[in-house]
Amino acid sequence: MAGKTLYDKLWDDHVVTQRDDGSCLLYIDRHLLHEVTSPQAFEGLQLAGRQPWRLSANVATPDHNVPTSKKERDQGIAGIEDDTSRIQVQTLDDNCKAFNIVEFGINDIRQGIVHVVGPEQGLTLPGMTVVCGDSHTATHGAFGCLAHGIGTSEVEHVLATQCLVQKKSKNMLVRVDGVLGKGVTPKDVVLAIIGKIGTAGGTGYAIEFGGQVFRDMSIEGRMTVCNMAIEAGARVGMVAVDDKTIEYVKGRSYAPKGEQWEQAVAYWNTLHSDVDAVFDAVVELNGAEIEPQVSWGTSPEMVIPVSKAVPTLEQAKDDVQRNDWTRAYQYMGLNAGQALADIQLDRVFIGSCTNSRIEDIRAAAEVVKGRKVAPSIKQAMIVPGSGLVKQQAEKEGLDKIFLEAGFEWREPGCSMCLAMNADKLQPGEHCASTSNRNFEGRQGNGGRTHLVSPAMAAAAAIAGHFVDVRSF
């Protein structure tokens, strides 16, 4: 009998019962909540007269709608100008109080983007099933977790039962061996993967990321890669547990202590695919060949190395891709064959659940130090992923580096990743962004998003256009 993959092990460990249709009832260890997908779920509980099944499994924080300007944040929820956003944040606050759920509120130092806060607090632990009403929940798979996003009706179901009906995915291994070159980051790795397999390449699969590149990669880097598994079409992305994983978790607020810690570590050390495990699909890349990446179009798969030009229609693989590229040229205001360096940028955004952790901010600061934002850039902003990330960056003096260069240093939140708060692009503006999606209107109506790493975004802010950070 063949060995098990990591996904198989996690799935089997959480099956409560198997149903006649082949689906399974899975037990959920951790449920993370935010203000956008939870109001109707809480209302459903209230109407049915139910209480959360296991209070301690649920933790909430507002992130999508919170303002990132200090002036507004100092006023708390009342400082949120948009009525809908304010109501959503207030409703989360009210619901958490009514149901006695732990919430890191808008001015709590622990508040931040839910996928930054979970690992930071030790709420995300190896071997867990982790769900959240947010598609980028795959981030937590970096800890050897089975983590994925859920819809609002499922949020209610998890609150009420601590279980979820799911159908098992197939197994895919994405193996990246070799050593990354100077200036090549985890963000470039995952963009290169998506560029290779496309945004539907992982559909129906749980992706395990393996190989030397991931063994060498930091935990925060692994979070960046797993975060964008959904952009590759997979709900689930994960990396096997190793010593780095355990060291990262150790001592965090919600991590086990004492004898429980020793028992947990013994289990966590089993969380890897067996050597004889069989995957349904295997994708391989050579890490040494990956360059800094820049997305040029309106899908994450429309991505190329910074050294290349916008592809021409002759390079498209079929009529569907030709049509997609033609529409993307028009929306993005680009020409086929245009050099990336010729794209005039208007704004730079360094933040989001993909790239707002302390390592990301350090990488950007290293590029920015002693330089100035180009006069042609209307706005360059750094948005830490949590209050604690912000605090650590300020302790290291990174905020001063950015402020002296002409960047804005903001309060934590989802910010310009999506047009659900005050941080938005204007129509026609080009933005170098460390976020995860570049769909039409994602950062604001008519806004044009280019996905890059923190180092590439920082270099673009200084130059006013895209440059190869390796020679910057």
From Swiss-Prot:
Provenance organism: Acinetobacter baumannii (strain ACICU)
Function: Catalyzes the isomerization between 2-isopropylmalate and 3-isopropylmalate, via the formation of 2-isopropylmaleate.
Matches recorded under HAMAP family: LeuC_type1
Record keywords, A-Z: 4Fe-4S, Amino-acid biosynthesis, Branched-chain amino acid biosynthesis, Iron, Iron-sulfur, Leucine biosynthesis, Lyase, Metal-binding
Cofactor note: Binds 1 [4Fe-4S] cluster per subunit.
Pfam families, per the entry: Aconitase
EC numbers, comma separated: 4.2.1.33
Entries under InterPro entries matching the protein: 3-IsopropMal_deHydase_lsu, Acnase/IPM_dHydase_lsu_aba_1/3, Acoase/IPM_deHydtase_lsu_aba, Aconitase_4Fe-4S_BS, Aconitase_4Fe-4S_dom, IPM_dehydratase_rel_enz, IPMI_cat
Pathway it works in: Amino-acid biosynthesis; L-leucine biosynthesis; L-leucine from 3-methyl-2-oxobutanoate: step 2/4
Protein name as it appears in the record: 3-isopropylmalate dehydratase large subunit
Cofactor list: [4Fe-4S] cluster
Record-stated family: Belongs to the aconitase/IPM isomerase family. LeuC type 1 subfamily.
Reaction catalyzed: (2R,3S)-3-isopropylmalate = (2S)-2-isopropylmalate
CDD domains found in the cross-reference section: IPMI (cd01583)
Positions annotated to bind [4Fe-4S] cluster: C353, C414, C417
Keyword Lyase assigned: yes
GO BP annotation list: L-leucine biosynthetic process
GO MF term list: 3-isopropylmalate dehydratase activity; 4 iron, 4 sulfur cluster binding; metal ion binding
The organism's taxonomic lineage, starting at the top: Bacteria, Pseudomonadati, Pseudomonadota, Gammaproteobacteria, Moraxellales
Assembly with partners or alone: Heterodimer of LeuC and LeuD.
